[in-house]
Amino acid sequence: MTIYLLLAASGFIAWIISTIGGGGGAMLLVPLVGFVAGAQAVAPVTTLATLVAASGRAFVFRRDVEWRVVGWALPGAAIGGLLGAAAFSSTSAEWLQIIVGLFLISTVLQYRLGARKRTFEISLWWFFPAELLVGFLSGLVGAMGPVMNNLYLNAGIVKERMVGTKTAVSLPMHMVQLGTYSALGSMNGKLFLFGAAAGVGALASNWLARRFLREMRARDFRAIVICFMALSGIVMIWGQRAVIVAHF
């Protein structure tokens, strides 16, 4: 019972932070899930937790969705998520996490800690290939952190619109991933309970997090998002420190 309460409390805190930071709640759960269930359980457990939490977030932010972005991003995310989850049991993704971590850290320099609104101009169709890649990587490791935030910031989508739009894209993707994990035998009853516990805790945080977000200035939001991206990158690289040490 203690483990389930710890997962629920961690989910609650992680999703408040991730809402204010533009996503990446599952990333904060990775160390705990890896400790209680093992590294191989991280992807299916965090996917279920994200799915449960995102259902509440989708309701809370339902009026803030940029549907033009969803039209491009959702197909890519669903296809990528399916392919990544299918390859989950037979693919090693350690170096991918290190590369993504370095990219996330670099955003601090790109945006000058939120002082710059954009670093490059984008077109909406970019969301399809970007979500295809991120969906695939998410299927492999379960949590990619706020990787897509760079694209959203450059599209001028911030605060509630970023959270609402990202949720509308990620919710179906995580449904596809969870179904694939279950079909391939990567999700069992115990892992389901772990994911559900973290997800229920996260679900309760959505309303409180939205109140914080409403009162935040756009520039402050950008600065927090960028700092959280860098922190997520550090966490990803730290999680693969054994791989780096072994290589050198």
Which ranges hold each PLM region?
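Transmembrane alpha-helices of Major Facilitator/SLC transporters
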Residues: 78-84, 199-209
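Residues within membrane-spanning alpha-helices of integral membrane proteins
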Residues: 4, 47, 100-104, 108, ...
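Transmembrane helix exit motif
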Residues: 54-64, 85, 99-123, 207-211, ...
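Membrane-interface helix-boundary motifs at transmembrane edges
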Residues: 63-68, 115-122, 155-160, 213-220
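Interfacial loop-to-transmembrane junctions
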Residues: 206-230
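Small-residue-rich hydrophobic segments that form or flank transmembrane alpha-helices
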Residues: 4-72, 130-135, 143-206
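Membrane-interface helix termini and inter-helical loops of multi-pass transporters
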Residues: 30, 85-94, 119, 181-193, ...
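Loop-to-transmembrane alpha-helix entry segments
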Residues: 67-72, 90-104, 215, 219-223, ...
